[in-house]
Amino acid sequence: MTVLAALIALVGSLFFALGAALQQYEASGTAKPGLPALLRRPRWLAGGASILAGGGLHIVALGLGPLTVVQPMGVASLLFALPIAATLHGRRPSRRELTAAGVVAAGLIGLVLLVPESDGPTHLGPSGVATLLAVSGVASSLLWAGSKIASAAGRAALLATGSGVLYGATATLMRVLVDGAWNWWYLLALPVPALLALMMLQRAYAVGHFGVSFASLQIADPLTAVAFGALLLGEPLPSGIVPMAAAALAAAGTVALARTTPLEARH
């Protein structure tokens, strides 16, 4: 079952990568990459369906195998996404891009495997949920503001990081709901960070630096969820030099991706 879980998770990563590449292709080709305009584009909608399929396969894989096997397979989406995006733009990813993506993936796998598992109940009161939404909202707003004065690659990274923060907050709130802390306003609040994250991500994709935006999202999302889990749910954090080295590796790979030429700019 473990091998089957790994294979399903790998296929899920492929679907997620395809969806991200399709959405980036459409967002980068739209003068105003807002949701109303993108929702009228069939290819962008197909990308959304592919992402949902990838998420569904990931959930199935988690039901069949251990987290330590399934989660690293999810990181493979970054390695799939770059060649797919390059093909859509009629280009070929450079060796430098693929190497940088591999470095990011290696760092992410290290971080995923080093996060301690928590066996305790997941409970968050109304004040905790309010804190979760406020902190993620302020952080993403600051990143949005910073993107206004950044270079193109920096803008893509900051917007995607803001999106990852909001997606991490969404994942944390969803975990609280799944574990039984049902509250009607929790359910009403859940779509807010998710929709804001989607909007910020499309803005990041529209900049054109797909590699750096997708890598930034892949890093910020799980790290935010881990941070909120530690701060608000009392979950353990990884400690020691190895997690720090893994984080540095992922960051270095993202910086290297930021220094590459956007796919759309190549001739």
Regions found by a protein language model. Give the residues of each.
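Polytopic alpha-helical membrane proteins, predominantly small-molecule transporters/carriers
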Residues: 1-267
